[in-house]
Swiss-Prot record:
Pfam families: Oxidored_nitro (PF00148). This is Light-independent protochlorophyllide reductase subunit N. Keywords: 4Fe-4S, ATP-binding, Bacteriochlorophyll biosynthesis, Chlorophyll biosynthesis, Iron, Iron-sulfur, Metal-binding, Nucleotide-binding, Oxidoreductase, Photosynthesis. [4Fe-4S] cluster binds at residues 32, 57, 118. It comes from the Bacteria. It comes from Rhodopseudomonas palustris (strain TIE-1). Pathway: Porphyrin-containing compound metabolism; bacteriochlorophyll biosynthesis (light-independent). The lineage of its organism: Bacteria, Pseudomonadati, Pseudomonadota, Alphaproteobacteria, Hyphomicrobiales.
């Protein structure tokens, strides 16, 4: 069943509680959490991500990153051969040897992540014990942690969640009694700098970003820390921070003008910023972003869009496209729907929209074909087959790689959806 949204009425609190959400469990089409290395290795500039996996794992990360291995990026793969999988060698000895060689060759590494994969988990290689053992050997010069990037029952953005959650225990305890703001989730450096300037202009002091650009500059956390989520796919990280005493601020996510304004306002209210000052600081940016967005309304307004579950960005994106660009939501599916973290977003979605958590890919493909939307947001594995059927697609992974948060990027985000439609129109003409 599909729902064709014709209005833009939003959900009240009571309707939010009673909103029907379809839950599906079946065959899925997603990348694994190893994909998160592609943006994390660029973000944490003195870290290295060592995947303990197969040649397939190595090809995935290298291809997704678009980096040739001889360029010495900050990631690599300790490839498990057949003899390792068969138990003919001691995998721990081999891992110790690889790590020793790596750290000798790359003295700039201050933080090493051992990243588990499907093969390493199949043979029950205990990377947590390996990380502890190697940390004792190489500390204090190098901190060694581990997390799982396995694709078993996960989606690709969960790699960042697992990575950051493993880093939370390393954060120093907060000693300052003044309240601090911790922005959680990887942001492009240009976006991070924009937000830092905005917080400074608002008078919100003591702001840190997690993950940091350098592992030697980890932010502190404690009971006076307020968390502002920049990405919706970090439940384990937020839970770990809350266990350290931090408190999450309820806010929409900073996509588009409305989302960015609500996100900034949540921080401003928590830090007692005067509403008049908030208006003074944000109004010029809002106006500029709204003008830039208006150029895309003629192309996107009234177009019907269908979301396959892939990145966990689906609900904030749907809110942005529906409310700011007048697109009609046929179905919005997401791999996992954290109702508490997405509560502010769900309030802003049209009441009639069909929401789906999880995926049965065959059933969802059937619904998509029946609906014949103008554009489909999906993973790479589904994009080419749908394009062959004449359905315009947008790769969901591109929405994670591209800077899309904040006022300055609102029009860039809109263009990501307009571009495939323009391309299709030119091909048909």
């Amino acid at each position: 069943m599909t729902v064709h949204v014709t209005g833009c009425s939003t959900a009240t609190a009571d309707q939010l509680v009673s909103r029907e959400i379809r839950t599906e469990s079946g065959q899925r089409e997603v990348f694994c959490g190893l994909t998160g290395i592609v943006w994390l290795h660029r973000k944490i500039q003195d870290a290295f991500f060592l995947v303990v996996g197969s040649r397939t794992c190595a090809h995935l990360v290298q291809s997704a990153a678009g980096v040739m291995i001889f360029a010495e990026p900050r990631f690599g793969t300790a490839i498990m051969e057949e003899k390792d999988l068969a138990g003919l060698t001691d995998a721990n000895d081999e891992l110790d040897r690889v790590v020793t060689q790596l750290l000798a060759r790359r003295p700039d590494i201050k933080l090493l992540f051992l990243v588990g994969s499907c093969p390493s988990e199949v043979i029950k290689l205990d990377l947590s014990r390996a990380a502890f053992r190697l940390s004792q050997r190489f500390s204090p010069g190098v901190r060694i942690l581990n997390y799982s990037g396995s694709g078993i029952e996960t989606t690709f953005t969960q790699g960042e969640d697992a990575c950051l959650a493993s880093l939370v225990p390393e954060l120093p305890a907060q000693t300052d009694t003044k309240p601090s703001l911790l922005v959680v989730g990887s942001l492009a450096d240009v976006v991070e700098d924009q937000f830092a300037r905005m917080f400074e202009a608002l008078g919100v002091g003591n702001v840190a970003f997690f993950p940091p650009r350098k592992s030697t500059a980890l932010p502190s956390v404690g009971p006076n820390t307020k968390i502002l989520m920049a990405q919706p796919f970090l439940p384990d990280t937020v839970r770990a921070l809350e266990e350290r005493g931090a408190k999450r601020l309820a806010a929409p996510f900073p996509l588009g003008v409305e989302g960015t304004t609500g996100w900034l306002r949540a921080a401003a209210d928590a830090f007692g910023v005067d509403p008049a000052k908030f208006e003074q600081v944000t109004a010029p940016n809002r106006a500029r972003a709204e003008r830039a967005l208006s150029a895309f309304k003629s192309e996107l307004g009234g177009r019907r869009i269908f979301f396959f579950p892939d990145s966990q960005l689906e609900i904030p994106l749907a809110r942005f496209l529906s409310r700011e660009l007048d697109m009609q939501l046929v179905e919005v599916a997401t791999p996992y729907l954290h109702r508490e973290h997405l509560a502010e977003e769900l309030k802003l979605l049209p009441i009639e929209v069909a929401l789906t958590e999880g995926q049965d890919v065959d059933d969802q493909l059937d619904r998509c074909r029946i609906a014949r939307p103008d554009i489909v947001v999906c993973g790479l594995g589904l994009a080419n087959p749908l394009e062959a059927e004449g359905i315009t697609t947008k790769w969901s992974i591109e929405l994670v790689f591209t800077p899309i948060q904040g006022y300055e990027q609102a029009a860039d985000l809109a263009e990501l959806f307009a571009r495939p439609l323009v391309r299709r129109a030119k091909l048909v003409a």
